[in-house]
Amino acid sequence: MPLSCQHFRKLLLLDEEAGPLEEELPRLADEGLNHRVAEDLNLQLPNVSIPWTHKVGNFTGLYSSTAPVFNPNWQTPSFPDIHLHQDIINKCEQLVGPLTVNEKRRLKLIMPARFYPNSTKYFPPDKGIKPYYPEHGVNHYFQARHYLHTLWKAGVLYKRETTRSASFCGSPYSWEQELQHGAEPFCHQPFGILPRASIGPAVPSQHKQSRLGLQSQQGHLARSHQGRSGSIWARVHSTSRRSFGVEPAGSGRNHNTASSSSSCLHQSAVRKAAYSHLSTFERHSSSGHAVELHGFPPSSAGSQSKGSVFPCWWLQFRDSEPCSDNCLSHIVNLLEDWGPCTEHGEHLIRIPRTPARVTGGVFLVDKNPHNSSESRLVVDFSQFSRGSTRVSWPKFAVPNLQSLTNLLSSNLSWLSLDVSAAFYHLPLHPAAMPHLLVGSSGLPRYVARLSSTSRNHHHQRGTMQNLHDFCSRNLFVSLMLLYKTFGRKLHLYSHPTIMGFRKIPMGVGLSPFLLAQFTSALCSVVRRAFPHCLAFSYMDDMVLGAKSVQHLESLYTAVTNFLLSLGIHLNPGKTKRWGYSLHFMGYVIGSWGTLPQDHIVQKIKQCFRKLPVNRPIDWKVCQRIVGLLGFAAPFTQCGYPALMPLYNCIHNRQAFTFSPTYKAFLRTQYLTLYPVARQRPGLCQVFADATPTGWGLALGPQRMRGTFVAPLPIHTAELLAACFARSRSGANIIGTDNSVVLSRKYTSFPWLLGCAANWILRGTSFVYVPSALNPADDPSRGRLGLYRPLLRLPFRPTTGRTSLYAVSPSVPSHLPVRVHFASPLHVAWRPP
């Protein structure tokens, strides 16, 4: 007779009528019983010939490509002028005094961030914008180009001007000013003595000694382009490369040093005029010497493709006869002035040799599942996560559920801050630009790649007879609709462009690490500045807690002003006030403990409604199901061990079939969720120990012992002893000398025992006691007459490695009757 859900729960000792634990529990460790139950629940059947189910409700396989939906009316989000202040350490020290070593180290990591992989693959610019939406290729191209242009205007991207120069918008950092054309003048060295930094050939005019400010950075740059003789920065821009800021021979280096920062900023303003006139002119620096500045030819971006006969593909249509009603010349003739072929930034800097290639592709998706009106740029730098160009990213601690509960479970009032475009706050060194390139090859190449006529363009590119090969009804209609949106920018976006990241991009594994370091250091500073409050962050999610709503509001004002003074942009509209139940990282955290948020509970209910019975489900779909159920597993009776059959099928890449009993068992598990409570400090009075043949307990002054029917593996025996100690004493702090029991991971034990032990030991805290000092060691070996003295073992709850580098205030047990506004610092609390 198949096992019913009720009998199964009884077997797992989840119901009250179970017999004595010392008899019932060891049976669950029996291998034969585990096999029989698995067969009864259909958990270990071999693969069957029934076709697999590849979709359960909204869940499809992790690797199945769900077609993204393109929205032709996507709005490109606006980005504020984000400029994180360079003297962030000084500003923090003004607030709290000297920073700790940990805080300083974290803040130095991101000023500027550095990314120098050993090897980088370069792809043709055709692959810059991914053809994710074949039906809307042209529309997607212009939307993506507009997004990139918006990021460039906001100072998030560099624009490659030549192989060795790039322009950008926004305020320059000091390391960029050192690399700025014109900021540091060249000077002749008549004796041909080279600065220490340069290894290249001796030439009369030389750059400043250290181009990057730090010698170590030159090593990075030199290594990133091995195989080419000489240092990159030591090469001099000849006149053919358009040198900026060249000073006449004979003038000493010291003349222009004082005015270097002012002259480079002044020059950036003057440069706009230079671009508009497209001519060479002279200006006088504050040292009185004439400084020569060369403008760019109009098609500097487009002219990189050798052999192009005509300056601009777009404007050629103006001089040609229309080939049909769908000819692009009709669109080009709509406007007299289409604007420049290329735009230049406010500042120009020298960069390492950067090819006209991309290292990752981009495409657009909905901003989030709840907002499909705005787009989000997805950058695919996956080359740095796989293959020969793989980079091993630094690891960082993510708070586990118990640590998070210990830290945040309290009766504080909470609010969460929203940092807008958090990743784009952290600046990247210009030397990282050649590794993080995005862009496009221009509209004609993109259209040619999408169309089947691309082979024609290879042979006769740029000639008049194939100009009209591009004309088609689809392209004409798309461009006419886009003309209403973008106007004369259609011309600008139709040209090729290569851009490199100036701020950290989201598609690189280094970025979450850097963001976590940055926000944790800031929260550490805030906690020390306001010791009567609690600040905590995970990535860009920052929460503030205070004893009362009034305190919280004044704290919010002070912290917001502090963050704004550092140049951090907050979204005041998205600030959420949670009251006493904090919503954070998918959890609801209150004084009673932690539970999953309601939308996750609803998803789980929906999942069980859609879950088919007696049908093999693809293991990739099982991954999705386990991902959802695993998030809420700590809140159920049996926890993760209940999901072990699913984990095993995923590990073996086999289909999984839910039997009615196993599905009903899981559903009852997730029907009632129990909060994970905050651990309390205390003294350990109960100890457990075991040998393969017997167990022993020390319950205060009392000693107990027992034997197993058959010898058991030592870890299993230790787990059983801990369960007996909990059920006999009811103590929630138990001392043990077994590391597996201490870890509270019961997934490697026999399945039935793991499920039962998880429920028995729920809410129990363990303290490590060495075997030699364990009072339960003698009883476990059958020696009841020997009494070792009970240890005074204190248990202190841990907050894990959650980047709490400053002293974190503990949480008051209750709200004070009256809040003293005079000086909240007098009631500062100490850490738990």
Curated annotation (Swiss-Prot):
Residue ranges of the region described as Polymerase/reverse transcriptase domain (RT): 336-679
Matches recorded under InterPro entries: DNA/RNA_pol_sf, DNApol_viral_C, DNApol_viral_N, HBV_DPOL, Rev_trsase/Diguanyl_cyclase, RT_dom, Viral_Replic_Matur_Polypro
UniProt catalytic activity: DNA(n) + a 2'-deoxyribonucleoside 5'-triphosphate = DNA(n+1) + diphosphate; Endonucleolytic cleavage to 5'-phosphomonoester
A GO MF term: DNA binding
EC number: 2.7.7.7, 2.7.7.49, 3.1.26.4
Keyword Transferase attributed: yes
Domain of life the protein comes from: Viruses
Positions that bind Mg(2+): 418, 540-541
Segments for region (Terminal protein domain (TP)): 1-177
Signal peptide: none
SUPFAM superfamilies: DNA/RNA polymerases
Site (Priming of reverse-transcription by covalently linking the first nucleotide of the (-)DNA): 63
Domain remarks: Terminal protein domain (TP) is hepadnavirus-specific. Spacer domain is highly variable and separates the TP and RT domains. Polymerase/reverse-transcriptase domain (RT) and ribonuclease H domain (RH) are similar to retrovirus reverse transcriptase/RNase H.
Role: Multifunctional enzyme that converts the viral RNA genome into dsDNA in viral cytoplasmic capsids. This enzyme displays a DNA polymerase activity that can copy either DNA or RNA templates, and a ribonuclease H (RNase H) activity that cleaves the RNA strand of RNA-DNA heteroduplexes in a partially processive 3'- to 5'-endonucleasic mode. Neo-synthesized pregenomic RNA (pgRNA) are encapsidated together with the P protein, and reverse-transcribed inside the nucleocapsid.
PANTHER family per record: POL PROTEIN, RIBONUCLEASE H
Similarity remark: Belongs to the hepadnaviridae P protein family.
Name of the protein: Protein P
